[in-house]
């Protein structure tokens, strides 16, 4: 390590905790990127949720607000054997794979039973990445909304139903 730092040996104060909040909601695997001077954070609902949310901020370190549902991971996998994963995890954003107007995510899945990873029909389809392309994500904060009050971008799934 280099630079000025110190080991914290006491519980943070309420003020320090408030200062350190990136967002008010919990989640996992956050990814931050910049588009036209606004910073966006995408994050999986916690814990191991199927809902993927997007937030926005004026700064890369937050606070991120305006949580909006970006897309929901499917309940089943497009695979042989048992199509129901125990959970989706490790949502990753791939900016290098994203084209204009889209976001590309990958994620993995767990089987319900650890031993289903081996010598079962479709076992190779667990623990492999599944890719999702989200089109028109820039319009998620537009004022035109659907019946549920949220604008929904278009999602294309590669490897999942």
PLM regions and their residue ranges:
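Carbohydrate-active catalytic/glycan-binding domains of CAZyme proteins
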Residues: 1-161
